[in-house]
A protein has these predicted regions:
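Short, low-complexity, Lys/Arg-enriched N-terminal segments of secretory-pathway carbohydrate enzymes
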Residues: 1-35
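Intrinsic low-complexity, intrinsically disordered segments enriched in polar/basic residues
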Residues: 8, 15, 20, 41-42, ...
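Intrinsically disordered, low-complexity regions
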Residues: 28, 32-34, 68, 80, ...
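Membrane-entry signal-anchor segments at the cytosolic-membrane interface
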Residues: 34-48
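Hydrophobic membrane-insertion alpha-helices, especially the h-region
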Residues: 46-60
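Aromatic-capped interface at the extracytoplasmic side
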Residues: 63-73
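Soluble extramembrane regions of membrane proteins in the secretory/endomembrane system
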Residues: 71-365
């Protein structure tokens, strides 16, 4: 008789396990039913706070770069060797009262006479250990052709230009004569720029020149006059010759800088060039072109109390997008010099116009 095989109690029951697993899954699904799983999201308050931090940080950087300016000094506060913004602004007043001084005008002759008289006075009052030479330089004829910028592939012929050149030499350093630093700006203006002024007001901490055309570039010339006066009193304060070039013809194709750098005998002694410019009527004077050697900009950054600059400006300027040029282009391309090009550009909308009646703040000087 055959016996029916009995199922072992130890044999695995797979069907039971499957049913058990299914029941557990169903139970977990029931437990999780109605529970929403959310991803982490930032609240609107967090985004608002982040935006406020970015705005405040940007404002702080702007304030530090462009609004952190020195307190203007009077001549008494600056002393013999210091720089007085109030004294410089007096030169702005005198030059802008002449009206537009374009090449060939009577006003440009008066402006040259004013600058020459101020330089002769600096020569008379200079420290006995500083040699001061003043040269009225006349250019008969010349021509320039630049490799880039708005004057690329254009030949510009110029004639009958007058410049004033000042050279300062420390008597105790004879080698300084062959190692000069050039500081340059232009006296001439465009014909559309008016020079009339209504008044000249003095305040406790600021002084504004409310005159039309105080920018390009009577303010630069005034800075150079005051800077030259201060340097003339430094007996042992400098080791290189300093040449100040007050040129004419910048508005006519950079002719003034080109004629000086190619024809004046002192130009061969220059090792670095600093150009002062204006493309507006206020703001902080900042570097917008430099190089090609980094020595000048590195030195400026290490010693300047209020350094400011933006290398992006140089790229934009060199691209030709902005149809303008400065004397620094001549010093860099023609003379092969390294250096710095300073500019202030607030209220650029009134640049080179007869309605440039926005006040020139004293701290811009």
């Amino acid at each position: 008789m055959r016996r029916r095989p009995e199922s072992s109690s130890t044999a695995p029951d797979t069907s039971a396990k499957k049913s058990s697993g299914t029941s557990k899954t169903d139970e977990e699904a029931k437990l999780n039913h109605g529970i929403q799983i959310r991803t982490a999201r930032r609240s609107s308050f967090t985004w608002l706070t982040l935006f406020a931090v970015i705005v405040y940080s940007s404002w702080a950087v702007y304030q530090y770069q462009y609004e952190n300016l020195p307190v203007p000094l009077t001549a008494e506060q600056a002393g013999k060797r210091g720089f007085s913004e109030v004294a410089a602004m007096k030169h702005v007043k005198a030059l802008t009262e002449l009206g537009p001084h374009t090449i060939g005008s009577d006003a440009i002759e008066l402006a040259l006479q004013y600058v020459l008289a101020e330089l002769e006075n600096i020569k008379k009052t200079a420290h006995w250990e500083v040699d001061v030479e003043v040269d009225l330089f006349h250019v008969t004829v010349g021509a320039t052709r630049l490799d880039s910028g708005m004057f690329v592939d254009r030949t510009i012929i110029y004639s009958d230009l007058d410049h004033i050149v000042l050279r300062m030499l420390p008597k105790y350093a004879p080698e300084a004569r062959e190692n000069a630093i050039l500081v340059s700006s232009h006296i001439d203006t465009v014909f559309s720029t008016s020079g009339y002024s209504d008044y000249f007001s003095l305040r406790k901490t600021s002084l504004c020149c409310f005159r039309e055309g105080a920018g390009d570039c009577s303010s630069c010339v005034s800075v150079m006059l005051e800077l030259a006066r201060g340097i003339s009193q430094w007996a042992h304060g400098f080791k290189n010759a300093v040449i100040f070039l007050f040129n004419t013809g910048e508005e006519e194709g950079l002719s003034g800088a080109h004629s000086f750098i190619t024809q004046h005998p002192w130009s061969t002694t220059i090792r670095m060039a600093i150009d002062l410019e204006a493309m507006g009527i206020g703001g902080k004077s900042a570097i917008f072109q430099a190089g090609p050697h980094p020595l000048a900009v590195e030195t400026f950054a290490s010693v300047a109390k209020y350094p400011s600059g933006n290398i992006i400006f140089q790229d934009i300027f060199s691209s030709g997008v902005i149809k303008s040029a400065t004397d620094f282009q001549v010093y860099r391309e023609v003379a092969g010099l390294s250096g710095l090009d300073f500019v202030y550009a607030d209220h650029g909308a009134v640049y080179h116009t007869k309605v440039s009646s926005v006040s020139l703040p004293l701290f811009t000087i």
